[in-house]
Amino acid sequence: MKCKNLRMDFAPKTQYDRAIKGAWKSAESNPKKHEEPKKYEEKEKTNMKKNSRRDFLKASAATFGAALLTACGSSGSSTASTATSTSSAESGPRTVSYWIDLANTSGADVKSMGDLYCWKAIEANTGINVEFQHPASGQAAEQFNLVVAGNEMPDIMYYSWATNYSGGADAAIEDGKIIPLQDYMEEYAPNMTHYFELHPDMLADITTDSGNIYGFPAIYTSTAEGSKEWQGVFDREPFAESFIGLVIRTDYLEQVGMDVPVTYDDWYNVLKAFKEKLGLKYPMCFVQMFEQMSVAISAGFGVCVPVSGFSAAYGYGINEENKVEFGPVKDGYKDYLAFLNKLYSEGLLDNDYMVLDRTSVQAKILQGYVGAWIEMMPTGLGNLKSQILKDDPNNTFSAVGVHEMVKTAGTENWYHQANQPFTGSVGAITGSCKDVKTAMELLDYGWGEEGNMLLNWGIEGESYEMVDGWPQFTDAIIHNKEGKAPSTAHSMYRQLNGPFPEDHWQRLVSKTDYSLAEGEIDQNIASLNTWSYENGKHYNGLPATTLLDSEQAAYSGAFNEIGTYVGEMTAKFITGTESLDNFDDYVKNVYSMGMQNCLDIQQEALDRYNARVK
């Protein structure tokens, strides 16, 4: 039988057929030789309506407050001196120093971002020489603090300033470490200005509570669901994407004669059948607190649950009344725990989940013991598939990513396993920058069509081609001579992430496992789009809020204690060492630790964020 409930209708078949199958089947065996990059053209900028940009920025200023270019402390003299030297490099070669964590933004085996083909083209097109500075791998946080503490900083620093600088971005501006950009955007960043004209709500993410625009953001964007044509940078919408979620063995489903589970009852019945009919040792298996894993299970109960060591962003959600709530104290959390306790008690959930790591979970999957788990796509499934077939060419292994669990079929969850469109990191212009114009023009180039294609796709004719209006990889990427995975081969041509709009379609295509058979590629795409387009329709977690210095100390002290307690009690409730009859007492204890004050602080931060949008 064929399993039902497989959602593979993300978009018209044109999107899959033209782009994926076209690349898989008919990529050129001899890619076109890379032509000399065109000289930097101003057409993207001049095509914009200058008056509308001016009106937009004026309206933003009225909304966010007066521009703070003469902030208190050392920033006054620093910003002023910088502003007067914005054109100092006009008469000679233009050079910009750029600090960025290579390990988290490249993905290629290079010593400098400047070695990437996209950046070679950017330097040629813009006429700007970029001197990259990279912290040692794994030491970005420490070296960020050291660089910022010094008197001389690079012109551009790409990092999460709002959360990593004491006091946030406003404090960094007041201290003269970075400059506010609102007075420069119209002239020096017309591409980004135009993008925010089209998507004004996103401006709040890079605007401080005091009204300062403090950097060029890294955001996820996507061609509209169902679109028959790929969309350029200005038409793509901000997008809450996810490349992680629930996976189930469809070959096992066929063996037990059942469809892909949708509701909690469906999941229970399927896992029970896996155990009783197939003798699976671990019908469901996952790593404790695996990033976003719990939301795929908890969302149907109306709660957002904490993961990743109970960081401040997780566990909190925004309800239908636009109020902040904490999932682990809601009634739905009790239902979530009861469901997992039921699976645990009946041997349907691996009883060792508290101590499992990703390697041990994969080992059990490879042995055929697991029917459902949490996976990252597509590298996770692709690697598993290749390892299984290597040992057993006749293995029927087939798995697909599925929707979050729901209470009732046909209903839509409020919370989803998705990342917010804004990643939290920005390219900020530092107070040491002597040529603001050049630094901003460099970053703004990535917000125009030409620069954005380079950063996302690489070199046209070499790493990608346009086929029926869709970018698709050439054979140099898909079937490269070195035998590398497409994502690895592509890493030399594009920047993995950074202060520009990232194209979800590129991320989707680059993550496709082309070693799979044609039908399995179809499943691969279906899984990714189930998670990103179905699960990620809404992001109702906390946006890019910031806490005041006066709030941070009180909040951290209380929430750290709460996080530890919630984690301990969650494990006890799931394993049954603590009866769920004591759930109300547990909630009272959480509030006695200062939960209400934490909620009040987060609500005030959300209110300030919302005020930026209005």
Give names to the regions the model predicted:
Residues 182-186, 210-212, 217-295, 318-364, ...:
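Helix-loop-helix "hinge/cap" segment bordering the ligand-binding cleft or interdomain interface
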Residues 4, 31-33, 39-45, 49-52, ...:
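Conserved N-terminal structural module of periplasmic/extracytoplasmic solute-binding proteins
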Residues 169-171, 289-317, 338-505:
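Extracytoplasmic/periplasmic substrate-binding proteins
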Residues 450-571, 577:
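Conserved small-residue motifs centered on glycine
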